[in-house]
């Protein structure tokens, strides 16, 4: 009975790993386009979405001056494997 449990567990692990390896992976998210100053994440997302350039939101990051934050708009970058297939 113990060997049946071990083999069932091994099959489950193989199936899970196969699904994970075969599922498409999205590109990574890069936030590198400055879009002005922001005070909170909500305002930064609004700024980036209003630009309408396929941005997926934005992030407020601290500037070098105290009390100031810079809004960086984010976009998805495709993985290198997807770029090579194009």
Swiss-Prot record:
GO terms for cellular component: extracellular region. Disulfide bonds join 31-74, 38-60, 44-71, 48-73. GO terms for biological process: defense response to fungus; killing of cells of another organism. Residues 1-27 form the signal peptide. It is found in: Secreted. Keywords: Antimicrobial, Disulfide bond, Fungicide, Plant defense, Secreted, Signal. Belongs to the DEFL family. This is Defensin-like protein 97. It comes from Arabidopsis thaliana. The lineage of its organism: Eukaryota, Viridiplantae, Streptophyta, Embryophyta, Tracheophyta.
């Amino acid at each position: 009975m113990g060997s049946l449990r071990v083999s069932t567990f091994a099959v489950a692990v193989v199936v899970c790993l196969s699904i994970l390896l075969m599922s498409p992976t999205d590109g990574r998210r890069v936030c590198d386009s400055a879009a002005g100053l922001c005070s909170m994440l909500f305002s930064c997302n609004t700024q980036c979405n209003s630009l309408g350039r396929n941005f997926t939101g934005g992030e407020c990051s601290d500037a070098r001056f105290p009390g100031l934050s810079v809004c960086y708009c984010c976009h998805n970058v495709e993985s290198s494997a997807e770029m090579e297939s194009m």
